[in-house]
Amino acid sequence: MLSSPRTERVLQLAGPTVVVAVGVLMLGWSWMKWPVPLVDFGQQLYVPWQLAQGKRLYVDLSYFHGPLAQYVNALVFRFIGTSLWAIVNVNVVVLAALVVMLYRLLGQVGSTLGAMAAGVVFMVMFAFAQFAVIGNYNYMTPYEHSATWGMLTSVASLFFLGRFFEEGGISRLAASGTCLGLCFLTKAEIFLAAESRRRRSLADRPPR
């Protein structure tokens, strides 16, 4: 039976291993096939490069989303070096953190098997994929870093909120609010979705 304790223990060990293995395979299979620098992703290199040179967002550079992702990438360029590899390395970390939190969240609301299946689907369909001629829609070289950072911070807000419901602790609630505040500095539509879900969760919070 899938619900037996022994099977659950096996899945708890195998689940993360399978997701990581699929991620590594997809990374190798898609290696350096991600960006199209002449379209949207070119802006994602140009804006932080100019910020690292002293330009000011919204004053010297036109930009339509929040400042978080671009200033993070500008710091990366300033302290690590201006290169595509610097951004890709940061995006690998963003992707890894996002997958870990998604796996934990889905395991809490569903099952370990469901979390593993969702993690595999995410790695195959979204993390590295290219379904259009323009290779902008992946997490390695996204069309807009505010989208990937928005996903990370919104999921982090819900992750810490879930930990607060399970274990209590004002620090977890504060972490959830901080991540939501950071999400506000990414993309408006992602923030609105995260805030709506957070409000509903707090309204439905069971008494402790």
Predicted segments, located by residue:
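Transmembrane-helix motifs of polytopic, lipid-linked glycan transferases
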Residues: 89-118, 123-128, 156-160
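Aromatic- and kink-enriched transmembrane "portal" helix at the membrane-lumen/periplasm boundary
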Residues: 84, 98, 120-153, 160, ...
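Extracytoplasmic catalytic/substrate-binding loops of multi-pass membrane glycan-assembly enzymes
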Residues: 32-47, 57-72, 82-85
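Loop-to-helix entry region of an early transmembrane alpha helix in multi-pass inner-membrane enzymes
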Residues: 67, 71, 81-100, 119, ...
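Membrane-interface transmembrane helices that cradle and orient dolichyl/undecaprenyl
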Residues: 149-175, 202-207
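Perimembrane helix-loop-helix junctions
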Residues: 2-5, 193-208
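Start-transfer (signal-anchor) and selected internal transmembrane alpha helices
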Residues: 1-28
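Membrane-interface alpha helices of multi-pass inner-membrane proteins
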Residues: 172-188, 194-199
